[in-house]
Protein backbone atom coordinates (compact mmCIF):
# COMPACT_ATOMS: atom_id res chain seq x y z
CA UNK A 1 0.00 0.00 0.00
CA UNK A 2 0.96 3.66 -0.28
CA UNK A 3 -1.31 4.95 2.49
CA UNK A 4 -1.96 4.00 6.11
CA UNK A 5 -5.67 3.67 5.36
CA UNK A 6 -4.81 1.03 2.74
CA UNK A 7 -2.09 -0.73 4.72
CA UNK A 8 -4.25 -1.68 7.69
CA UNK A 9 -6.84 -3.70 5.69
CA UNK A 10 -4.01 -5.37 3.76
CA UNK A 11 -2.18 -6.45 6.92
CA UNK A 12 -5.06 -7.60 9.09
CA UNK A 13 -7.61 -8.72 6.48
CA UNK A 14 -5.47 -9.55 3.41
CA UNK A 15 -7.39 -6.95 1.40
CA UNK A 16 -5.29 -5.39 -1.38
CA UNK A 17 -5.67 -1.75 -2.38
CA UNK A 18 -7.04 -2.29 -5.89
CA UNK A 19 -9.55 0.56 -6.05
CA UNK A 20 -9.23 4.30 -6.52
CA UNK A 21 -10.75 4.79 -3.07
CA UNK A 22 -9.51 3.01 0.08
CA UNK A 23 -11.76 0.13 1.12
CA UNK A 24 -12.33 1.69 4.56
CA UNK A 25 -14.00 4.79 3.08
CA UNK A 26 -15.61 3.08 0.08
CA UNK A 27 -19.31 2.25 -0.29
CA UNK A 28 -18.37 -1.40 0.31
CA UNK A 29 -16.97 -0.98 3.82
CA UNK A 30 -20.19 -2.21 5.38
CA UNK A 31 -19.85 -5.64 3.82
CA UNK A 32 -18.78 -8.71 5.75
CA UNK A 33 -15.05 -9.38 5.77
CA UNK A 34 -12.80 -11.88 7.48
CA UNK A 35 -9.54 -11.01 9.19
CA UNK A 36 -6.96 -12.51 11.49
CA UNK A 37 -9.13 -11.33 14.39
CA UNK A 38 -12.40 -12.80 13.09
CA UNK A 39 -10.87 -16.18 12.26
CA UNK A 40 -9.04 -16.41 15.57
CA UNK A 41 -12.21 -15.41 17.45
CA UNK A 42 -13.81 -18.59 16.13
CA UNK A 43 -10.85 -20.44 17.64
CA UNK A 44 -11.20 -18.99 21.11
CA UNK A 45 -8.97 -15.91 20.88
CA UNK A 46 -9.71 -12.50 22.38
CA UNK A 47 -8.60 -9.64 20.11
CA UNK A 48 -7.88 -5.93 20.46
CA UNK A 49 -6.72 -3.20 18.08
CA UNK A 50 -4.45 -0.54 19.60
CA UNK A 51 -3.97 2.74 17.79
CA UNK A 52 -1.70 5.46 19.14
CA UNK A 53 -3.65 8.05 17.18
CA UNK A 54 -6.82 10.00 17.83
CA UNK A 55 -9.98 7.92 17.82
CA UNK A 56 -11.74 8.12 14.47
CA UNK A 57 -8.57 8.81 12.50
CA UNK A 58 -8.92 7.13 9.08
CA UNK A 59 -11.86 5.13 10.44
CA UNK A 60 -9.57 2.60 12.12
CA UNK A 61 -11.89 2.21 15.11
CA UNK A 62 -14.94 1.32 13.04
CA UNK A 63 -12.90 -0.87 10.72
CA UNK A 64 -11.44 -2.78 13.66
CA UNK A 65 -14.91 -3.73 14.86
CA UNK A 66 -16.11 -4.63 11.35
CA UNK A 67 -13.02 -6.83 11.04
CA UNK A 68 -14.05 -8.75 14.14
CA UNK A 69 -11.89 -7.28 16.90
CA UNK A 70 -13.41 -7.43 20.38
CA UNK A 71 -12.01 -4.06 21.44
CA UNK A 72 -10.36 -0.91 20.12
CA UNK A 73 -8.04 1.24 22.22
CA UNK A 74 -7.00 4.66 20.93
CA UNK A 75 -5.83 7.95 22.37
CA UNK A 76 -9.22 8.50 24.00
CA UNK A 77 -8.82 5.34 26.08
CA UNK A 78 -5.18 6.15 26.82
CA UNK A 79 -5.93 9.64 28.13
CA UNK A 80 -4.90 13.22 27.30
CA UNK A 81 -1.29 12.97 28.49
CA UNK A 82 1.76 12.23 26.29
CA UNK A 83 0.12 13.85 23.24
CA UNK A 84 2.48 14.82 20.41
CA UNK A 85 0.24 17.72 19.41
CA UNK A 86 -0.58 16.26 16.02
CA UNK A 87 -1.23 12.53 15.54
CA UNK A 88 -1.50 11.03 19.00
CA UNK A 89 0.50 9.40 21.78
CA UNK A 90 4.28 9.19 21.58
CA UNK A 91 5.41 5.66 20.73
CA UNK A 92 7.48 4.83 23.82
CA UNK A 93 4.58 5.74 26.11
CA UNK A 94 1.95 3.92 24.09
CA UNK A 95 4.11 0.78 23.76
CA UNK A 96 4.34 0.44 27.55
CA UNK A 97 0.60 0.94 27.99
CA UNK A 98 -0.03 -1.60 25.21
CA UNK A 99 2.16 -4.19 26.94
CA UNK A 100 0.55 -3.57 30.32
CA UNK A 101 -2.92 -3.98 28.81
CA UNK A 102 -1.86 -7.35 27.40
CA UNK A 103 -0.81 -8.43 30.89
CA UNK A 104 -4.47 -8.30 31.86
CA UNK A 105 -5.72 -10.33 28.90
CA UNK A 106 -6.74 -13.95 29.16
CA UNK A 107 -4.76 -16.16 26.79
CA UNK A 108 -4.97 -16.86 23.95
CA UNK A 109 -5.17 -13.34 22.58
CA UNK A 110 -4.38 -11.49 19.36
CA UNK A 111 -3.50 -7.80 19.32
CA UNK A 112 -2.60 -5.27 16.66
CA UNK A 113 -0.67 -2.07 17.35
CA UNK A 114 -0.51 0.91 14.99
CA UNK A 115 2.13 3.43 16.11
CA UNK A 116 2.38 7.03 14.93
CA UNK A 117 5.68 8.73 15.78
CA UNK A 118 7.56 7.97 12.55
CA UNK A 119 4.93 9.88 10.53
CA UNK A 120 5.17 13.48 9.34
CA UNK A 121 5.79 15.92 11.06
CA UNK A 122 8.27 13.46 12.67
CA UNK A 123 8.02 14.81 16.21
CA UNK A 124 10.33 13.44 18.89
CA UNK A 125 9.53 13.91 22.61
CA UNK A 126 11.39 16.79 24.23
CA UNK A 127 13.17 14.41 26.59
CA UNK A 128 14.88 12.78 23.58
CA UNK A 129 15.71 15.89 21.56
CA UNK A 130 19.49 15.34 21.69
CA UNK A 131 19.54 11.55 21.99
CA UNK A 132 19.29 10.51 18.33
CA UNK A 133 21.20 11.52 15.16
CA UNK A 134 19.25 14.01 13.08
CA UNK A 135 20.60 13.19 9.60
CA UNK A 136 19.65 15.00 6.40
CA UNK A 137 15.88 14.58 6.78
CA UNK A 138 13.59 14.96 9.83
CA UNK A 139 12.30 11.40 9.39
CA UNK A 140 15.70 9.96 10.32
CA UNK A 141 15.59 11.25 13.88
CA UNK A 142 12.01 10.04 14.28
CA UNK A 143 12.93 6.59 12.93
CA UNK A 144 15.77 6.38 15.45
CA UNK A 145 13.29 7.31 18.18
CA UNK A 146 10.73 4.78 16.90
CA UNK A 147 13.44 2.10 16.95
CA UNK A 148 14.32 3.05 20.53
CA UNK A 149 10.64 2.88 21.51
CA UNK A 150 10.33 -0.60 19.99
CA UNK A 151 13.47 -1.64 21.90
CA UNK A 152 11.95 -0.51 25.19
CA UNK A 153 8.80 -2.49 24.40
CA UNK A 154 10.75 -5.70 23.92
CA UNK A 155 12.83 -5.03 27.04
CA UNK A 156 9.60 -4.99 29.03
CA UNK A 157 7.75 -7.66 27.03
CA UNK A 158 10.44 -10.31 27.45
CA UNK A 159 9.77 -10.30 31.20
CA UNK A 160 6.05 -10.99 30.77
CA UNK A 161 4.41 -14.44 30.93
CA UNK A 162 2.99 -14.22 27.41
CA UNK A 163 6.28 -13.33 25.70
CA UNK A 164 7.63 -16.80 24.89
CA UNK A 165 4.27 -17.96 23.57
CA UNK A 166 3.78 -15.04 21.19
CA UNK A 167 4.37 -14.65 17.47
CA UNK A 168 5.40 -11.06 16.79
CA UNK A 169 4.85 -9.62 13.31
CA UNK A 170 6.43 -6.24 12.56
CA UNK A 171 5.90 -4.33 9.33
CA UNK A 172 5.17 -0.87 7.92
CA UNK A 173 1.90 0.47 6.58
CA UNK A 174 3.75 2.23 3.73
CA UNK A 175 7.11 3.69 2.77
CA UNK A 176 8.35 7.12 3.80
CA UNK A 177 10.38 9.76 1.95
CA UNK A 178 13.06 8.30 -0.34
CA UNK A 179 16.70 9.29 -0.53
CA UNK A 180 17.88 7.22 -3.50
CA UNK A 181 16.59 6.55 -7.01
CA UNK A 182 16.02 2.88 -6.14
CA UNK A 183 13.19 3.77 -3.78
CA UNK A 184 11.52 6.17 -6.19
CA UNK A 185 10.61 3.55 -8.81
CA UNK A 186 7.22 1.85 -9.04
CA UNK A 187 8.82 -1.06 -7.21
CA UNK A 188 10.83 0.90 -4.68
CA UNK A 189 7.88 2.97 -3.45
CA UNK A 190 6.37 -0.25 -2.08
CA UNK A 191 9.47 -1.82 -0.51
CA UNK A 192 9.01 -2.38 3.22
CA UNK A 193 10.27 -5.10 5.57
CA UNK A 194 8.15 -7.80 7.21
CA UNK A 195 9.59 -9.47 10.30
CA UNK A 196 8.27 -12.61 12.00
CA UNK A 197 9.69 -13.33 15.45
CA UNK A 198 8.84 -15.94 18.07
CA UNK A 199 11.36 -16.38 20.88
CA UNK A 200 13.04 -19.76 20.64
CA UNK A 201 10.64 -21.04 17.97
CA UNK A 202 11.66 -19.32 14.71
CA UNK A 203 15.29 -19.54 13.69
CA UNK A 204 16.89 -16.32 12.34
CA UNK A 205 16.72 -16.17 8.55
CA UNK A 206 16.73 -13.50 5.86
CA UNK A 207 14.41 -14.02 2.91
CA UNK A 208 14.66 -11.68 -0.08
CA UNK A 209 11.93 -13.30 -2.16
CA UNK A 210 8.73 -11.43 -3.04
CA UNK A 211 6.21 -10.87 -0.26
CA UNK A 212 3.37 -8.44 0.41
CA UNK A 213 1.23 -7.19 3.28
CA UNK A 214 -1.62 -9.43 2.16
CA UNK A 215 0.57 -12.46 2.94
CA UNK A 216 0.58 -11.71 6.68
CA UNK A 217 -2.92 -13.04 7.41
CA UNK A 218 -2.48 -16.44 5.69
CA UNK A 219 1.04 -16.73 7.15
CA UNK A 220 -0.11 -16.12 10.72
CA UNK A 221 -3.12 -18.43 10.41
CA UNK A 222 -0.98 -21.10 8.77
CA UNK A 223 1.64 -20.84 11.52
CA UNK A 224 -1.12 -21.33 14.11
CA UNK A 225 -2.35 -24.38 12.18
CA UNK A 226 -5.81 -22.91 11.62
CA UNK A 227 -7.65 -25.24 9.27
CA UNK A 228 -10.91 -23.43 8.57
CA UNK A 229 -11.34 -21.70 5.19
CA UNK A 230 -10.99 -17.95 4.85
CA UNK A 231 -10.70 -15.38 2.05
CA UNK A 232 -7.23 -13.92 1.50
CA UNK A 233 -5.41 -12.29 -1.40
CA UNK A 234 -1.99 -13.51 -0.29
CA UNK A 235 -0.15 -16.69 0.59
CA UNK A 236 1.50 -18.43 3.54
CA UNK A 237 5.12 -17.28 3.45
CA UNK A 238 6.20 -20.24 5.60
CA UNK A 239 4.93 -22.67 2.95
CA UNK A 240 7.79 -23.22 0.46
CA UNK A 241 5.34 -24.17 -2.29
CA UNK A 242 3.33 -20.94 -1.99
CA UNK A 243 3.23 -18.73 -5.06
CA UNK A 244 5.03 -15.44 -4.43
CA UNK A 245 3.73 -12.17 -5.86
CA UNK A 246 2.88 -8.61 -4.86
CA UNK A 247 -0.12 -6.88 -6.45
CA UNK A 248 -0.92 -3.16 -6.31
CA UNK A 249 -2.85 -0.38 -8.05
CA UNK A 250 -1.74 3.21 -8.53
CA UNK A 251 -2.72 5.96 -10.97
CA UNK A 252 -5.06 3.74 -13.04
CA UNK A 253 -2.39 1.06 -13.42
CA UNK A 254 -2.34 -2.41 -11.90
CA UNK A 255 1.04 -3.87 -11.08
CA UNK A 256 2.28 -7.33 -10.19
CA UNK A 257 5.76 -8.30 -9.07
CA UNK A 258 6.80 -11.94 -9.34
CA UNK A 259 10.19 -13.51 -8.74
CA UNK A 260 11.00 -12.89 -12.41
CA UNK A 261 9.17 -9.81 -13.64
CA UNK A 262 7.40 -6.61 -12.72
CA UNK A 263 4.45 -6.06 -15.05
CA UNK A 264 2.03 -3.14 -15.41
CA UNK A 265 -1.50 -3.52 -16.78
CA UNK A 266 -4.26 -0.99 -17.49
CA UNK A 267 -7.11 -3.47 -17.03
CA UNK A 268 -7.18 -4.32 -20.74
CA UNK A 269 -3.64 -4.31 -22.07
CA UNK A 270 -0.20 -5.12 -20.76
CA UNK A 271 1.75 -1.86 -20.67
CA UNK A 272 5.25 -2.59 -19.41
CA UNK A 273 7.44 -5.40 -18.14
CA UNK A 274 10.81 -5.31 -16.38
CA UNK A 275 13.34 -7.88 -15.20
CA UNK A 276 13.56 -6.15 -11.86
CA UNK A 277 16.27 -8.32 -10.31
CA UNK A 278 18.68 -7.26 -13.05
CA UNK A 279 17.14 -3.82 -13.63
CA UNK A 280 16.56 -2.38 -10.18
CA UNK A 281 15.77 1.11 -11.49
CA UNK A 282 13.29 -0.24 -14.08
CA UNK A 283 15.11 1.43 -16.94
CA UNK A 284 14.58 -1.23 -19.62
CA UNK A 285 11.06 -2.18 -20.66
CA UNK A 286 11.28 -5.75 -22.03
CA UNK A 287 7.68 -5.82 -23.29
CA UNK A 288 7.68 -5.54 -27.09
CA UNK A 289 3.98 -6.08 -27.75
CA UNK A 290 3.99 -9.86 -27.24
CA UNK A 291 2.30 -10.97 -24.01
CA UNK A 292 3.58 -14.55 -24.24
CA UNK A 293 6.69 -14.31 -21.98
CA UNK A 294 4.60 -12.69 -19.26
CA UNK A 295 1.43 -14.81 -19.37
CA UNK A 296 2.06 -16.33 -15.94
CA UNK A 297 2.23 -12.91 -14.30
CA UNK A 298 -0.56 -11.45 -16.46
CA UNK A 299 -2.99 -14.30 -15.77
CA UNK A 300 -2.24 -14.16 -12.06
CA UNK A 301 -2.93 -10.43 -11.99
CA UNK A 302 -6.14 -10.78 -14.00
CA UNK A 303 -7.34 -13.50 -11.62
CA UNK A 304 -6.63 -11.32 -8.58
CA UNK A 305 -8.50 -8.38 -10.11
CA UNK A 306 -11.44 -10.57 -11.12
CA UNK A 307 -11.72 -12.21 -7.70
CA UNK A 308 -11.35 -8.92 -5.85
CA UNK A 309 -13.96 -7.09 -7.94
CA UNK A 310 -16.43 -9.98 -7.78
CA UNK A 311 -16.09 -10.42 -4.03
CA UNK A 312 -16.28 -6.71 -3.24
CA UNK A 313 -19.32 -6.12 -5.47
CA UNK A 314 -21.16 -9.20 -4.20
CA UNK A 315 -20.25 -9.00 -0.51
CA UNK A 316 -18.16 -12.18 -0.70
CA UNK A 317 -15.03 -11.09 1.18
CA UNK A 318 -15.66 -13.66 3.90
CA UNK A 319 -16.46 -17.36 3.89
CA UNK A 320 -20.08 -17.78 4.91
CA UNK A 321 -21.88 -21.02 5.83
Could you describe each region identified by the protein language model?
Residues 1-321:
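Solvent-exposed soluble domains appended to multi-pass membrane proteins
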